[in-house]
């Protein structure tokens, strides 16, 4: 009997060609991001010369280390495809329609940013933006974004801005949560795939949820965010899949609208550096509450000072150049201790490019007995 080739397995030639295409795709995005930042920085410094004194230059050695770290991240991204963590198509996922539509708006938005910088306005919102009901720490022009996180325009520009900031590898950084989450969910191997429930806290425009869907095609996915505008954008993105039914909630992560012990897995990407310390603890405790015993909680956020002291200048540059009022406290905070205080067991931390990852377990009775 003649065997049928498995279409999911690439031939060595196809695999090499696909990897080459992925490397070219990432290199193109990296070069474009560098060019964009170079031009926009020059323009900003010309308009506001004092900005140049706020940062310290990075050494050639540090720049080389960053470049090597980015390349390592791309290699890990490719290896996870080879391991079957997510399909190869995920590597080429882009937001080209949004890029073509909204990239010019990024340049048109620059004069507004310059005007706020000159007036030192960091909590500026349009008159028609509803601000009632939001915590004070949230009402900020994070990254100098016009209207903070509270307008549709901000939501439309966000993914472009973040991807350029991270040299075109923002989604690759997000995807590093997928392997530990998938490994953690093996605890529930007896649960049918369609009954697995995963929550993305501070889901924003839905990029992480889209990656989760590629990794867990049958799971029930949930997202929660404090911005109605970003939830609308997430709904738009996720609804591009005609079989998707986005389960999105508008809520503060300090008070999640979900029952106790509900989710098999919980993720949180790029949130904690934009929270004051008390809010970080409250969010972690809420994540503990809604996670099932035996469930996994994975955090992705900025690298911290204790892990990468050689990057101190770069970390200081980030908080100086972008409006990140809680960043200096965050890079010195111990999220491991916060996780354990909430009741989680910290399994491991990882560093990939500019991000740090915490993988935590909510102990069940079996785990507690084994540890005692």
Where in this protein do the model-derived segments appear?
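Conserved SAM/SAH-binding beta-strand->alpha-helix loop
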Residues: 227-229
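Conserved SAM-binding strand-loop segment of SAM-dependent methyltransferases
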Residues: 241-256
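A short acidic, Gly/Pro-enriched loop at the edge of an enzyme's catalytic core
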Residues: 254-266
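C-terminal alpha-helical "lid/dimerization" subdomain adjacent to the S-adenosyl-L-methionine
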Residues: 281, 298-342, 346-352
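Core SAM-dependent methyltransferase catalytic element
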Residues: 342-372
């Amino acid at each position: 009997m003649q065997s049928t080739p498995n279409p999911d397995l690439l031939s060595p030639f196809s695999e090499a060609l696909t990897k080459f295409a992925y490397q070219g795709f990432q290199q193109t995005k990296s070069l474009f991001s560098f060019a964009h930042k170079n031009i926009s920085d020059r323009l900003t410094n010309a308009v506001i010369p004092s900005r140049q004194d706020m940062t310290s230059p990075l050494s050639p050695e540090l720049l080389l280390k960053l470049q090597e770290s980015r390349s390592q991240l791309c290699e890990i991204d490719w290896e996870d495809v080879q391991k079957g963590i997510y399909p190869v198509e995920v590597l080429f996922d882009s937001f080209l329609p949004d890029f073509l539509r909204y990239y010019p708006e990024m340049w048109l938005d620059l004069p507004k940013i310059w005007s706020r910088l000159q007036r030192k306005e960091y909590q500026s919102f349009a008159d028609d933006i509803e601000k009632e009901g939001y915590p004070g720490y949230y009402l900020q022009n994070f990254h100098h974004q016009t209207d903070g996180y509270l307008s549709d325009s901000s939501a439309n520009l966000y993914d472009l801005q973040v991807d350029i900031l991270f040299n075109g590898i923002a989604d690759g950084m997000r995807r590093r949560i997928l392997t530990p989450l998938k490994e953690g969910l093996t605890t529930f191997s007896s649960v049918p795939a369609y009954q697995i429930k995963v929550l993305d806290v501070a889901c924003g425009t839905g990029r992480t949820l889209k990656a989760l869907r590629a990794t867990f095609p049958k799971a029930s996915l949930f997202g929660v965010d404090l911005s109605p505008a970003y939830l609308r954008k997430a709904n738009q993105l996720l609804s591009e899949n005609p079989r998707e039914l986005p389960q999105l909630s508008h809520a503060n992560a300090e008070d999640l609208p979900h029952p106790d012990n509900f989710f098999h897995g919980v993720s949180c990407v790029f949130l904690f550096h934009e929270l004051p310390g008390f809010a970080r603890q409250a969010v972690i405790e809420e994540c503990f509450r809604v996670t099932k015993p035996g469930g996994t909680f994975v955090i992705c956020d900025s690298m911290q000072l204790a892990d990468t002291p050689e990057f101190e200048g770069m970390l200081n540059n980030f908080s100086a150049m972008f409006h990140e009022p809680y960043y200096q406290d965050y890079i010195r905070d111990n999220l491991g201790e916060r996780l354990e205080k909430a009741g989680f067991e910290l399994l491991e931390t990882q560093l990939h490019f500019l991000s740090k990852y915490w993988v935590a377990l909510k102990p069940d009775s079996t785990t507690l007995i084994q540890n005692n």
